[in-house]
Design a protein with these regions (language model features):
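Short beta-strand edge/turn micro-motifs at domain boundaries
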Residues: 96, 115-143
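Short solvent-exposed loop/turn micro-motifs enriched in small/polar/acidic residues
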Residues: 10, 79-81, 115-116
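A solvent-exposed, acidic/Ser-Thr-rich amphipathic alpha-helical stretch
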Residues: 5-6, 24-91
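Residue-level recognition of conserved beta-strand positions in structured domain cores
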Residues: 39, 99-100, 134
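Short, cysteine-centered beta-strand-loop-beta hairpins and adjacent loop/turn segments enriched
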Residues: 104-113
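Hydrophobic/aromatic beta-strand elements that line small-molecule binding cavities or substrate pockets
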Residues: 81-87, 101-103, 118-124, 137
Length: 143
């Protein structure tokens, strides 16, 4: 059996490569159909009472359209991601990855969208493959 931590690390790296390569299909393949993605209004809003759902529950067509639009209108300046922790459930059927993200997008007009902070990515092993079921929005921790 392959080490679950190594498998999760591979999924995180696959997601990073998908952003780097603007590969919508690979991004979409990572998500479980029940994926939800709560997002804090700012990277400093640690209290989940303020969080919102920008994209709602996973919808392949809708989420794909959002990312195709992003890729068509923005250049990727940099995409730095560092895995800080991977934890696997005792039964090996669930996991989380704590990832520090620093991704900068820029439009041709110079407008920037900076994704910076720490994420908790939650995965379940479904039919032998790891799929993301939840991902917190990026939070700054002053580290």
């Amino acid at each position: 059996m392959t080490d679950a931590r190594s498998e999760i690390e591979e999924v995180v790296h696959r997601e990073t490569r998908a952003w780097d390569e603007r590969d919508v299909e690979t991004l979409l393949s990572i998500f479980h159909p029940d994926m939800v993605w709560p997002w804090p209004p700012t990277p400093h809003d640690h209290d989940p009472m303020t969080w919102v759902f920008v994209m709602g529950r996973f919808d392949r067509e809708r989420w794909g359209a959002v990312w195709r639009e992003l890729f068509a209108t923005h250049d990727l300046v940099h995409n730095h991601r560092t895995i800080r922790r991977i934890e696997v459930t005792p039964d090996g059927d669930g996991a989380l990855a704590i990832v520090d993200v620093d991704t900068l997008w820029r439009t041709p007009a110079g407008m920037e969208s900076h994704w910076k902070g720490r994420a908790c990515k939650v995965y379940a092993k479904v039919d032998g493959a790891w799929q993301m079921t939840m991902h917190t929005g990026l939070l700054e921790y002053g580290l």
